[in-house]
Amino acid sequence: WNENWLKESARILKPTGAIYLISGWRFSGMYHSLLNTEFHIQTRITWRNSTPKDQPKSLTWINRISDIWFATKSNEFMFNQEAVTEGSNQMNPESAIEMGVTNLWSDIMDIQVGSTVKMEGDKPEQLIQRILTASSFKLNWVVDPFTRSGGVGVIAKKMGRRFIGFESDQDQLLMAMKRIDKE
């Protein structure tokens, strides 16, 4: 199943396009292997997810991170480092320009920010904004194969991107479409 949707993603992705796959630690290794068959993996971003809601109480270490796999169709891809550096709170601007942005994102919390209403399953607006800023320009297409409540679509629309979303649950898709149109 995962191989099928990743193959379709590779098929429709433009040559300079990118895929960002957000995963918890349990499935991260599997996704690394699967992505490696269709894409060029550029890096693994570690995002500090501060609210592990769906995680059972642990007898050992509580996981507070998610992996974001950044992969591209080719090694010639769009990456807007200057725009990401300007919008990053990770470091002061001088060292960001000197060092570049890092793959450790501890400055984005899993809480509601901005005017977008956060729905169940939505990632933080700032997280999606950073990803879209890094790998797209206004009027570029953003595809979300797991639209759920439409959070990525709402943010893409706010940022002037065109959006296509897929969702297997028809009721959920209709609610997401309504949400994207409204916001």
Report the location of each language-model feature.
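Core catalytic lobe of class I
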Residues: 1-175
